[in-house]
Amino acid sequence: NVYWINFGRNIGSEFQDYHYALVIYESKYTALVVPLTSKKDHTPKWIEENKEVIVDIGKIEGYPDDSKECYACTFMIQSVSKKRLDRCGNKKDGYFQIKVTDKQMKMVCDKISEITYNKITKGNIDN
C-alpha cells in the first residue's frame, strides 16, 4: 500500500514533511518505506544522476490525480514509526486507497535487491 507519510524535519536532501511512500514491510510498530516522487518535479539531470537507484513505476492506481506518474526512490528507503502513516483524503471528501500493482512492487523490490547485490559483488562491503 501507499501511504501519506509525515517524514518530519530532516537534514539536507532527505525527504521531509508529507510525501507519499510505498510500504514494503510492516512490523508491529514500524514500517519500511520507499519514498515516491512525482516525475514532473524532476529535471532530466536529476533523473540521469539517479537512474541506477530510482524506479519509474508510472501511474499508481487510486491517486487523486490519475495523471500523476511516479518514481520510487529506492536509495532513500527508511524505517518509520507506523504513527507516521496517514490515510489519503479527509473526513469531508472521504479517504481513498492507493495501491501499486504486483508488477510495480516487484520492480521496486528487484531494484533494492540489485542495489544490495551490486554493493556486495563489487567488494564495497568491509569485512
Predicted regions and their residues:
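Short coil-to-beta transition motif at edge beta-strands of beta-rich domains
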Residues: 1-9
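Short beta-strand or tight-loop elements
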Residues: 3, 17-19, 70
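A mature extracytoplasmic/lumenal domain signature
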Residues: 9, 35-37, 78
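Polar low-complexity intrinsically disordered regions
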Residues: 10-12, 127
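Compact nucleic-acid interaction/catalytic patches
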Residues: 13-61
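C-terminal terminal-subdomain/extension
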Residues: 47-127
